[in-house]
Amino acid sequence: IAAIDMRRKNDVTFQKTLSFTDWYLDGGKGYPLGAVQLIGKVQGIMMKSFAKHVPLPLLNLVSDHSVEFVVMSEDLPHPENRVTIAQNGAIKIARKSVGMKTHMELLRRAKKTLRKTGYQAIFRQPFDISMNSHQCGTTVAGTDPRTSVVNGYCRSHDHHNLYLIDGGFFPSSAAMNPALTIAAQALRVVAESDLSKV
């Protein structure tokens, strides 16, 4: 979301980092709401990708008076969510979204809070699956090869010399950047699996 207040200029190049998770576990029914964080400073030319009909000078003006946040909810695991390869070699993505109600509640609360702080307009730009980051899942970790791809140390059940140390073993990203946890898991796998001796 972009929060705009034409009375306040925000012409920074490198915006400070801010994030809040005050409502993370406030979703009820087992679905967390998520996190809200600044995404850096969006420039007018960047806005052009989703506002093609708006003149660039106007987008630059808006950008000079806005702050931009990503409102990210946890994508909880679901057995029907999967990536497969079709007979013709095409990648097939099946995704069942189970937390949209709670995501919309998080979005509502974030907008309400930004309005209370004086922002005059708030614009939402939803991203579909083609705008992906923080990919997690698809190589389920577990002890049973019938229901999982890797063990707890990311070692493939089918190929014992193959370790899949990326975000695939996560059941969820927890609405956070998984990079540090992936790095920690890689160090754990190397230490516990004697890979350092290879």
Task: Briefly describe each language-model feature range.
Residues 1-12, 166, 179, 185, ...:
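Glycine-rich loop(s) and the adjacent beta-strand/alpha-helix scaffold that form part
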Residues 1-67, 198:
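Mid-to-C-terminal "cap/lid" subdomains and adjacent gly/pro-rich loops that border
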Residues 5-7, 23, 71-75, 142-144:
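Structured loops at beta-to-helix junctions and adjacent beta-edge loops in soluble globular domains
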Residues 10, 58-63, 75, 130-131, ...:
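A general structural signal for short secondary-structure junctions and capping/turn motifs
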Residues 56-58, 85, 114-115:
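Fe(II)/2-oxoglutarate
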Residues 68-70, 92-93, 98-173, 179:
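A glycine-rich dinucleotide-binding beta-alpha-beta segment and adjacent secondary-structure elements
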Residues 73-79, 172:
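Active-site beta-strand/loop architecture of penicillin-binding DD-peptidases
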Residues 81-95:
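Short His/Asp/Glu-rich catalytic/ion-coordination signatures at enzyme active sites or charged loops
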